[in-house]
Design a protein with these regions (language model features):
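Short, flexible coil/linker segments at domain boundaries that flank nucleotide/cofactor-interacting
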Residues: 1-2, 76
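Conserved acidic segment of CheY-like receiver
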Residues: 3-15, 19-20
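A structural signal for isolated positions on well-ordered beta-strands in alpha/beta enzyme cores
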Residues: 5-7, 34, 82
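Conserved sequence signature across two-component system core domains
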Residues: 9-10, 36, 54
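Alpha-helical interaction/dimerization surfaces of two-component signaling modules
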Residues: 18, 22-26, 45
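A generic structural motif
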Residues: 27-32
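Conserved Asp/Asn-Gly motif in the active-site loop of CheY-like receiver
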Residues: 33-40
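CheY-like receiver
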Residues: 43-126
């Protein structure tokens, strides 16, 4: 099975490092090809790496995960977005759905959710 190229985005350094270090991404079918600490940095990494999947925090300073999704869609870069959120506010979920988010996951994330996600994403045409 080919590994899905993954970019991870979170503006909280501790959470970003935790996402990078805590999970065995390769065993779940992902190759982490980049990470970003802001929406602006995420755009640069996504443009450069052309990942299959972007795992992004929804609320970040300056540029939100939703804004990143919008910009990438405008540029017609083909990738799947998985949004992470600590907020149970339905408005965020509604906005993400309008932008065709692939998956919306509430923090904290657990391994079972990520394994399920990996299997689900593997069935998409990336």
């Amino acid at each position: 099975m080919e590994l899905l190229k993954l970019v991870i985005v979170d503006d909280e350094p501790i959470l970003l490092q935790g996402l990078l270090d805590t999970y065995d991404w390769e065993s779940m079918g992902f190759e982490v090809v980049g990470s970003a600490k802001s929406g602006v940095q995420a755009l640069e990494v996504i443009r450069r790496e052309q990942p299959h999947v972007v795992l992004t925090d929804i609320r970040m300073k300056q540029m939100t995960g939703l804004m990143v999704m919008e910009e990438i869609q405008k540029e017609q870069i083909s990738c799947l977005f998985v949004v992470l959120s600590a907020y149970r506010d339905f408005e965020y979920a509604k906005q993400a759905i309008k932008l065709n988010v692939t998956e919306y996951i509430l923090k904290p994330v657990n391994v079972e959710e990520l394994n399920y996600l990996a299997k689900r994403l593997d069935s998409f045409d990336t």
